[in-house]
Structures are given as structure tokens and as C-alpha cells.
Amino acid sequence: MEKPVICRIKEIIEESPTVKTFVVDKDFDFKPGQFAMLWLPGVDEKPFGFSSKNSFSVARVGEFTKKMHELKEGDIIGVRGPYGTYFEPIGDKVLAVAGGIGAAPIITAVEEFSKQGIEITTILGARTKEELLFLDRFEKVSRLEICTDDGSFGFKGFTTEKMKEVLKEEKFDLIITCGPEIMMKKVVEIANEYNIPVQVSMERYMKCGIGICGQCCVDDEGLCVCKDGPVFWGDKLKFIREFGKYKRDASGKKIYY
């Protein structure tokens, strides 16, 4: 197993009340959708997707991310990676559907696809206006449709509701998505209705990040999210029984959505 690259935090951006972006002093050659293992000395190591070549956006959801949010500019972290599969463009028109912190890997894909001349529509969702991420970046490289659960900005409702509206008006060659797994399961179902290929970024509890420990294996195929994913094609998801239903915690216990 490779050693982490020691990086210094040169900037911390408060993206929302619960999300911070940590910009480090080294660039990484990653592909959109890939992740790295971030190491906090004396704490632990956890997986996070890239939000740019030298940054990671972290939502405060548990003890590790709480420690991350306590870091200051100038502090040290370790970065091991990049690892995993990534979003691959096909065709000339792509629909991107992002929810919550899932906007982080999606923005990297949208920016990369845009450089290749692909026309992109992004549906970006969050619970409230304050929790919407990367609005300026999405607007620069895609046609942006915004959804909030409470109606504080844009369309009031779920991204999947807006997705149905968009698909009634336009045709797309590919759909990519990242966000809450229940949302992504619905995205896949809608994509299948329209016979559009779809790529999904899954999240699972990980330890090694390279497919050795088996901590992130999913039922029934035994696929490792860290190595066979995190980005899966929709046709492979039919064989992952737990997708959209449950995940496992560190002890292996099922946590139902």
C-alpha cells in the first residue's frame, strides 16, 4: 500500500453551513469521480472525492469530518490516491444530477466534459438555498436547473421531479449522478424508462481504498466500491441488491435508508 502524500492546507472555503472545501498545496492527477484517502495524523483515514485537482469538499456528518472541520490553514493532512473508477463521457449531450455533497464529484465531471465540447445540463439539488454547492462553477460550464426541498431557491421539490420535466423536453446520450442513494436509485429507474445509459457514484464505508480488506464489498456480487467503483454503470447496479436499500457500517451491520 502506498504511503500518503503529506500536504499542507493553504485555504479553507466555507461552502455552506455544513460543507468546507480544503485546498492543499499539491495537485493530483485524478479523473472525475475518483477519490483519495485523507489521513488525519492521530485520528484516522477516510475516503473523499476530489472537488478539484487540489481540493476536497467535506460535509460535517460524523466524528472524522468534525475533526476535519476543526482544521486550520497551515495544518497538515495526508492524501493517498487517486483511486477507483470514474465518469466516462459518451455522446454529445449529458444530463448531470447532483444532490447535496454529491455535487463535488459531479462538478469535476461537468467541467471536464465541457472541455471536450459536450453539452451539459445540470440538475443541482439541496435541502435549502444555503446548502447549494458550486453554483458559479456549474453555471460557467452547463445549463443549470436548481432544486431545493423547501423552495427557498429554484424549483421546489426533488431533483428527480425536475429530471422528469427535463427529459420530456430534451434527449440525452448519458446521465451521471451522485448524491443520496435513494435519489440515485430513482435517477437510475427514470434513466431506464428513457433507455439512457447512466453512471452512478456510490459511497460505502472503506478502510484500505484498494480492494484488499473487503470492507466496502456490496451484496450480491461481492464488488468492492473502492476498486470496482465508486462509479458504476447502471446495468451493473441491477446485480447490487443493496443499492438504494441499505449499506453497512464499520461492524458490517445493515443500515437501511
Curated annotation (Swiss-Prot):
Q: What is this protein called?
A: Probable dihydroorotate dehydrogenase B (NAD(+)), electron transfer subunit
User: Does the record bear Iron-sulfur in its keywords?
Assistant: yes
Could you tell me which NCBIfam families the record lists for this protein? PRK00054.1-1 (NF000796)
Q: What GO biological process terms does the UniProt entry carry, in alphabetical order?
A: 'de novo' UMP biosynthetic process
- Which stretches make up the FAD-binding FR-type domain? 2-89
Q: Which InterPro entries does this one have?
A: Cyt_c3_hydrogenase_gsu, Dihydroorotate_DH_ele_sf, Dihydroorotate_DH_Fe-S-bd, Dihydroorotate_DHASE_ETsu, FAD-bd_FR_type, FNR_nucleotide-bd, OxRdtase_FAD/NAD-bd, PyrK_electron_transfer
Database matches in SUPFAM superfamilies = Ferredoxin reductase-like, C-terminal NADP-linked domain, Riboflavin synthase domain-like
- What are the UniProt keywords, alphabetically? 2Fe-2S, Electron transport, FAD, Flavoprotein, Iron, Iron-sulfur, Metal-binding, Pyrimidine biosynthesis, Transport
Please report which protein family the annotation says this sequence is part of: Belongs to the PyrK family.
Cofactor binding note of this UniProt entry: Binds 1 [2Fe-2S] cluster per subunit. Binds 1 FAD per subunit.
Listed pathway(s)? Pyrimidine metabolism; UMP biosynthesis via de novo pathway; orotate from (S)-dihydroorotate (NAD(+) route): step 1/1
Cofactors (names):
[2Fe-2S] cluster; FAD
Binding residue positions for [2Fe-2S] cluster: 208, 213, 216, 226
Q: Which GO terms describe its molecular function?
A: 2 iron, 2 sulfur cluster binding; electron transfer activity; flavin adenine dinucleotide binding; metal ion binding; oxidoreductase activity
Organism phylogeny: Archaea, Methanobacteriati, Methanobacteriota, Methanomada group, Methanococci
Functional note: Responsible for channeling the electrons from the oxidation of dihydroorotate from the FMN redox center in the PyrD type B subunit to the ultimate electron acceptor NAD(+).
What is its quaternary makeup? Heterotetramer of 2 PyrK and 2 PyrD type B subunits.
